[in-house]
């Protein structure tokens, strides 16, 4: 089965770092809901500011919060712009729909739903 993008939060800004936390990425519940992530879901993080890419999981936080925890805290700084993406194995790619949430300053600007048919 192909692995396709399921959910993406684009344009998030890191608001904090916690090196001595056990690990993960804290996202505000508002961000989790808008993008369609699940708590404890495995995600890929792409740091637009410095080019770092890493895998972690989501934990819910306060509205607007984007905190790099544990080892991930070494891969970004407060103020860095990041993209967070979740993928899934898809049995029927033709009917797959992904959610793309666009943020500015950690405030939701737009939500798009895209399908493979939108790509052709």
From Swiss-Prot:
EC code: 4.1.1.11
Principal cellular location given in the protein's record: cytoplasm
Residue positions, PTM Pyruvic acid (Ser): 24
Class of enzymatic activity (EC top level): lyase
GO CC terms in record: cytosol
Chemical reaction(s) catalysed: L-aspartate + H(+) = beta-alanine + CO2
MF (Gene Ontology): aspartate 1-decarboxylase activity
Keyword Metal-binding part of the UniProt annotation: no
Record localization: Cytoplasm
General function of this protein: Catalyzes the pyruvoyl-dependent decarboxylation of aspartate to produce beta-alanine.
Name by which UniProt lists this protein: Aspartate 1-decarboxylase
Source species of the chain: Pyrobaculum islandicum (strain DSM 4184 / JCM 9189 / GEO3)
């Amino acid at each position: 089965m192909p692995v396709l993008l399921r959910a993406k939060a684009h344009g998030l800004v890191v608001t904090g770092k916690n090196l001595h936390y056990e690990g993960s990425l804290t996202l505000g519940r508002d961000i989790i809901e808008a993008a369609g992530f699940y708590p404890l879901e495995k995600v890929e993080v792409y740091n637009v500011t410095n080019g770092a890419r890493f895998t972690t999981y989501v934990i819910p936080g306060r509205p607007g919060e984007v905190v790099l925890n544990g080892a991930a805290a070494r891969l970004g700084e407060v103020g860095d712009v990041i993209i967070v993406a979740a993928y899934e194995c898809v049995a029927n790619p033709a009917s797959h729909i992904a959610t793309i949430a666009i943020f500015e300053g950690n405030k939701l600007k737009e939500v798009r739903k895209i399908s493979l048919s939108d790509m052709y």
